[in-house]
Every structure is written in structure tokens, then in C-alpha cells.
Amino acid sequence: MTRYLFITGGVVSSLGKGISAASLGTILQARGLSVTLIKLDPYINVDPGTMSPFQHGEVYVTDDGAETDLDLGHYERFVRAPVSRRNNFTTGRIYESVIRKERRGDYLGGTVQVIPHVTDEIKRCIQEGADDVDVALVEIGGTVGDIESLPFLEAIRQMGTELGRERCMFMHLTLVPFIGTAGEMKTKPTQHSVKELRSIGIQPDILVCRAAHPIPEEERRKIALFTNVEPRAVIAALDVPNIYQIPEELHQQGLDHIVAEKWGLELPPANLADWHRVVEIMSNPEGEVTVAMVGKYVDLTDAYMSLNEALRHAGIQTRQRVNIRYVDSESLEREGCSALEGADAILVPGGFGQRGIEGKIEAVRFARESRIPYLGICLGMQLAVIEYARHQAGLENAHSTEFVRHPHHPVIGLITEWMTDEGEVEQRDEADDLGGTMRLGGQPCRLAAGTLINQVYGKDRIVERHRHRYEFNNHYRERLAEAGLSFSGWSQDGRLVEVVELPEHPWFIGCQFHPEFTSTPRDGHPLFASFLRAAIAHRDGTAQAFNHEQH
């Protein structure tokens, strides 16, 4: 029997509902419960796949190929349970399903309305996503009072009534601002937010109050009195320097105990030793390294959320503080590569579009010629191929068909546009296994024996997640291999290049997949850990080229 804990937000957005939900989920998991997390997004887009990173931040890709909200990344990093397309639903996806059913005649000619048809679809999606776990934590995006959120709030209100308090609970996240000029905290925004929620028919059981300063006991009692919530269930969520402290912070305030008690559950105590170790290492690093991340969304670091966290996870494994130096790729086109000087490693992440491309290519060249550890992810791998083709293989006008419609040397092309060994363009249609769509989700990859990537993973076959439309053009494989580029990873069928590396370089890897999506703070990821060890060696002046002949 699944129990549901619904998380709503008030006053302002971006208070950290996702991290709060994920933190509570990992505590409940540590107490022996099976847990899943679901995100309901009120926007009308079907998914965030076509949204600008400036609008939405990173698009998080699940193993089954869903393009989802970045909060699902927090879910997987905190809770050792995989998520899928069933863990993220948008208004667009809900309406798409309702309209499809109406066209099929499923509603028997009835008038299709928000209540009951849309709300019933929302409830169906929530229950389908819960999938027989002990507890489903369901986060409703946006802020109470937003018109877009109303159908979702009505749906969870109905679930609370239908399933009862023994199976449903409501947690509301609010802001308790500190007014510096007055020198005091203000509880009115929280009071009014809860009043708005209660007007919809939802009485929260727990309040999590974001605050920059400790909330005095008197203010806590006032909040409890005016919101009809038990004083002990008014939880202070203070600003912390490290989000991985939050599970322990919430546990110390008894949040998991309140949840278990309200549901009448007798659970073993939580073992949070793993989280304590993570926080201890991050608080007491043995050194620090600087990684230059070259991209075009550097003004909004949420666009690289999983990548930022993966580097920090590698810092935990190597006991280093990772300083990420964000470098605007367009600035490299104007000012040269001076912004990369002093970096211990260089990373070019995935991305789309032509803006800043030449700057990224210059960053690849700088890393190659300066023998600085380089990791290119997705687009970063493709640009490493282009740079090498231009400057080492004699293909001066090498480019990708993503940026130039008819380049003289299309070393990178659409998955549907391939050159045969005879140099003829082969057009694949939608009947092909990859079709004309983006390659998404977990895909198997074979690693060549004796290569650096093979040593990094310690295995011959891996599965990593993808999100791309373009791939290396096999017509140029022999030319680039003769020039010294190693092709060390392949798709399962051997048709697509997944990994390239430079044998004569201390550490230079480009991968078509996104390893950041499978990195977690407690387990890390072998590729990022190896990348950081190479950065440490470069910093300390002990870097040596990987000898393929000895492996």
C-alpha cells in the first residue's frame, strides 16, 4: 500500500522543494522504506527538451530516454532509486493525453472539463508513477496561487480526501524573510501562503520554512498558531553551504520521525553515515583543483547542474575542493585563451547551436597543445574531433553539419546523414532503429581493450545516457586514426563512435554520452574521478602520457 506525501511551495519559487523532497526521501530510505519521487510541472510544454537553458536550466535525461526537469537529477543523486518518464509530468503532457482520449471517444461523447477529466488524469499519472513503493513523494512545481497550478492542487486535494490521512500527507515549503533594517523575521508571507493553500482545501501537516537565520521559538509558535500546524512540525530549513548537509539537518529536527508517527509506522533508526562522510570530506578537503568549464550558458550555472555536481562528487572521491571556473566561449573568440591559463583541467560540456563554437574549438586546441587534461562531453567530443581534423589531420575546413549546411569535410553529421566508405551520402529514414529523432537515454557502449577509457571504467562494456542528434562521420575514421586520434568506444552494433582519445596526451577524452547523469555524491563516477586525478597530477607537475602499449 503506497502512501503519498505531497510537497507544495509558497511565497516565491526556487525555494528548494526538489532538494527538500530528495533529502526527506533519502532519510526515509535509510529507515527501511522503498521510496520514489515524482515531479508535476505546471507549464504547458510537453517536456523541457525544447526549452532554453536560460528559461529552465538543465534538461535531465533518464535512463529510459525521457527529457525531464532538473529536480529529477536531485532525486537520483540523493535517493538510490532510478527515475523514468513516469516520474515527471507536465500540464502539456496531461492535456495531450486527455485530448488523445477524447479523440478516441474514451469519454463517450461527454463534455471534457478540467474537473473531472484533467484532475483524474493527474491522479492516474501520480498513482502510475508510484509503482507499489512504500512512499511516493510528489512535488508540485511552481507556487501556490499560480493559475497554472490549480488543476494539480485540486487533484492532490481529491487524493487526500479519497485515500485519507492514513495514506496522504501534505508538506508546504515557504520563505520566512529577514528584514535587515528592522532586524527581525517576518512570518506574514508564510501565514498568507498557507491561507491560500487552505482556501483550496489543503491543510498542510508539515511546514518547512526557508530562512537565512535561525527561527526564534516565539516565531515558530506564531507560525504554528496561525497555520494550524503543530509547533514541532514547523521545520527550519536554514541556508547551508553544501546541499548534502540537508538530510542530516532535517533528520536532526525530526522531520522523518514526524512523518513516521503521523502514518503510524514503526521504523528502524536512520543510518546516515554515508552522508556524514560526504559532508566531512567536503568540509575538510586535502587540496583544491581548478577546472575551466567552457560553455555559452555560464551566466546560469543551473544549465550545467548535473555536471557541476559530478565534479564535486569527484572532489569527494579525491578529497579535493573543486573550483569551477566558468568561461564564456564567446569571450575566447574575442580575447583568446588567457581565461584558461592556470586551470588544472578543461571541460567542454554538451550544448546546441552555433554561438560560441569557435571559442570552444580554441579551448580544445589549448588543452591539446598545452597538455592540460581535457574532457569533452557530447558536443565537447564532436568539437575535439573537428579541432583535431583541422589542425592535425590536414582537413582545414572540417566542421559539423549542425553549424555549416555543406562543409567541405563534414566530420560530424546528423545521425540520419552518413557518408558510406565510398563517400556517398546515405539517408536513413524513420524505419531505422535510430530514426530521425534525437538519440536519448541509456545506450550500451563497447570499450576497446588497452585504452585509457577502458582503464578508467575497468570494464569492456558500459551503459551511459545520451542526448544528441549528431555523430562522428565514419568516412573520416581512417584519416583521423592515421593522424593519431584513437577511437576507443563504440555503440553496441559498432556503427557509432562513442569515445575518442589522444594516446600521446596525459589525459584527453571525448565521449558522446553524458556521464554526469549517473554520478552520485556517495558513489561518484569513474570518469570524473579519473579526470580529477589527472588534474591533480597536472597541478603537481607529475602528469605522464597514458601508455596504450602497456595495457
Swiss-Prot record:
Enzyme class of the recorded protein, top EC level: ligase
Locate the residues binding ATP. S14, L15, G16, K17, G18, I19, D71
Instruction: Write the Enzyme Commission number(s) for this entry.
Output: 6.3.4.2
Amino acids binding CTP: S13, D146, I147, E148, K186, T187, K188, P189, T190, Q191, K222
Q: Where does Mg(2+) bind?
A: D71, E139
The entry's function note states: Catalyzes the ATP-dependent amination of UTP to CTP with either L-glutamine or ammonia as the source of nitrogen. Regulates intracellular CTP levels through interactions with the four ribonucleotide triphosphates.
Subunit note: Homotetramer.
Name-wise, this protein is CTP synthase
Give the species: Halorhodospira halophila (strain DSM 244 / SL1) (Ectothiorhodospira halophila (strain DSM 244 / SL1))
